[in-house]
Design a protein with these regions (language model features):
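Conserved nucleotide-cofactor-binding alpha/beta core module
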Residues: 1-101
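Active-site capping/gating segments
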Residues: 90-127
Length: 127
């Protein structure tokens, strides 16, 4: 969640068979899409949309990684995880947490300290 230049999506594309990345800024989404295609990252699908809402169409996901801070991992994103899926999110409190989904429960583990811009709801047309 949070495509930006597409760098993180490209790295993840080297590790996974397919990657869906969601960006709220159309100009960033379009540029990242073209950049990733030109570099051969056909396994990365770039979506222009409200990343805070995730992308239900392609759910469930094995992993969801946020590049923007949230106060708490949104329940609707956890719901888009596959069984045994993992969500990684920086929190506005300054820590990065890993949330493991197991059956109907979720277990959270803090594993890093980071300061990241907060998530913003909605979409934007241009940067």
């Amino acid at each position: 969640i949070g495509t930006g230049s597409g760098y993180a999506a490209a790295v993840l594309g080297r590790l996974a068979a397919s990657v869906v990345t969601v960006e709220r800024w159309r100009t960033l989404a379009d540029a990242a899409h073209q950049r990733l295609r030109s570099l051969g990252y056909d396994m990365v699908e770039t979506i222009f949309g409200d990343g805070y809402e995730g992308h239900l169409t392609r759910a469930p996901y094995d992993r969801i990684i946020l590049t923007c801070a949230v106060s708490d991992p949104p329940p609707h994103l956890l719901a888009q995880l596959a069984p045994d899926g993992i969500l990684v999110a920086p929190l506005t409190a300054g820590v990065v947490v890993r949330t493991d989904k197991a059956d109907s429960a979720a277990r959270r583990t803090a594993f890093a300290v980071a300061t990241v811009d907060p998530a913003v709801h909605g979409v934007a047309r241009r940067l």
